[in-house]
């Protein structure tokens, strides 16, 4: 039996203590069929519900999230180890997401009219149907709602298959939808095995698929969706570059790098993983970064002042530790941490690796935990070349006083997002997604609303 599942149950283990939170029986084929039936039936009514009514329900969902914020945040912390202050912030961010789409989402579905020869034409955005969402554990509520809210405002229904170790969070979220007054079937939660996921993807009632997860999971889900000729959106990993040029404000850059690397105990897809520092400031940046990292409090994630909690699973900690060991054997310098913390729980010491080169493990692979890799660049052009020398392309950050230069460099960076003098973040006002092995498709902004829509051309009076 693994830490997160057996043949019959999804198992939730507290990563700070090793104690079991609970276990959740995998659903039968009949239960899965019933969930898909509810989602398909609900779609027929939900797509016809006036937009103002959908908006009203999203506003109610924001209220339901806030009403149980403490219970949901505590569940997140107990299931995957997120420090409680960050878990509370996740719930509030989700509430604001609901409110933002309640206000702005309907306009994103307005028809686009145009004059054409011999008549008039317009493009209408029609929902596709029930969307299957396979979601990860690192942001148990935000990752779900980031995709679900724009998908729902568009008129689709949503079937969530969550990670096995955060099923408690999934059920609390489902309860919030019920309290907000959403009709049955609009937001479904299924607890199934990988075989159950395959069954759902192949089922004709599922119109499309979205996944946030690993490259391996993305390839598997993408292949199955392709075999069924169904659209899919994949938000996969990232090994994001964080570029600091010689003229940058180092104090600001260091602060952003620390937050960008160590929030959520380093378990973030869009995070400052490869710190690419121009050689004129690499020594000073490194000194300040190590000192700032040393000040971070590691400990019980239920304590409000803890910044770094445990990693979500012991197997992930073992994998990270091996990546660090491999990088050190390849010639990197260990400046801080570099080992599993002693005692109970899946803790890993905040780690800083210096003298990392493009041939080393921590440069080539994604390190999903509290480990920063410092790489030296000769100049801005070399920094961009290093940034692009990756299988991933999620986000990138540039710190420099020369904003005009940064704007120029953005066109050279092979990523879905670029942040100038600020660390990467997801926000409903702008789209989110990657290129290369970071996936394809987009979430958030109007792109997220229309991602699972049929852009239908309506042509009138064509002669």
Regions found by a protein language model. Name each.
Residues 20-27, 42-48, 133, 242-244, ...:
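Short, well-ordered beta-strand elements within core beta-sheets of diverse protein domains
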Residues 110, 114-252, 377:
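Rossmann-like NAD(P) dinucleotide-binding subdomain of oxidoreductase/dehydrogenase enzymes
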Residues 216-357, 420:
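ALDH superfamily catalytic-core signature
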């Amino acid at each position: 039996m693994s830490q997160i599942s057996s043949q019959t149950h999804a198992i939730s283990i507290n990563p700070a203590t090793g104690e079991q939170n609970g276990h959740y029986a995998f659903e039968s084929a009949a239960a899965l069929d019933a969930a898909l039936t509810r989602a398909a039936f609900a779609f027929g009514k939900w797509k016809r519900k006036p937009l103002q009514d959908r908006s009203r329900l999203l506003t109610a969902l924001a209220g339901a999230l806030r009403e149980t914020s403490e219970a949901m945040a505590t569940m997140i912390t107990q299931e995957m180890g997120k420090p409680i202050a960050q878990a509370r912030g996740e719930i509030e961010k989700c509430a604001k997401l609901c409110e933002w789409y309640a206000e702005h989402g309907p306009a994103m579905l307005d028809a686009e009219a145009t004059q054409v020869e011999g008549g008039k034409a317009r493009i209408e955005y029609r929902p596709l149907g029930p969307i299957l969402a396979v979601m990860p554990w690192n942001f148990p509520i935000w990752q779900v709602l980031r995709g679900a809210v724009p998908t729902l405002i568009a008129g689709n229904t949503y079937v969530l298959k969550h990670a096995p170790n955060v099923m408690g969070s999934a059920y609390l979220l489902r309860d919030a939808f019920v309290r907000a007054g959403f009709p049955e079937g609009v937001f479904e939660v299924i607890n199934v095995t990988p075989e159950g996921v395959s069954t759902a993807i192949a089922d004709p009632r599922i119109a499309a698929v979205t996944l946030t997860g690993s490259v391996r999971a993305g390839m598997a889900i993408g292949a199955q969706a392709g075999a069924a000729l169904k659209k899919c959106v994949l938000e996969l990993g990232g090994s994001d570059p964080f570029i600091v040029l010689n003229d940058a404000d180092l104090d600001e850059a260091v602060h952003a790098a620390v937050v960008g690397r160590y929030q959520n105990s380093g378990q973030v897809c869009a995070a400052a993983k490869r710190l690419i520092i121009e050689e004129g400031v690499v020594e000073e940046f490194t000194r300040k970064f190590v000192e700032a990292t040393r000040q971070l409090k590691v400990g019980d994630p239920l304590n409000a002042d803890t910044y770094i909690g445990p990693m979500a699973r012991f197997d992930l900690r073992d994998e990270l530790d091996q990546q660090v060991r491999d990088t050190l054997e390849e010639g990197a310098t260990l400046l801080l941490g570099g080992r599993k913390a002693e005692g109970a729980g899946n803790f890993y010491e905040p780690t800083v690796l210096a003298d990392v080169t493009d041939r080393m493990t921590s440069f080539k692979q994604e390190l999903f935990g509290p480990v920063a890799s410092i790489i030296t660049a000769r100049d801005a052009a070399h920094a961009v070349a290093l940034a692009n020398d990756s299988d991933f392309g999620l986000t990138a950050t540039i710190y420099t006083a020369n904003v005009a230069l940064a704007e120029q460099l953005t066109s050279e960076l092979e990523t879905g997002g670029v942040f100038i003098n600020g660390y990467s973040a997801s926000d409903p006002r702008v789209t989110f997604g990657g290129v290369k092995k970071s996936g394809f498709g987009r979430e958030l902004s109007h792109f997220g609303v229309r991602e699972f829509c049929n852009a239908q051309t309506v042509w009138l009076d064509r002669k």
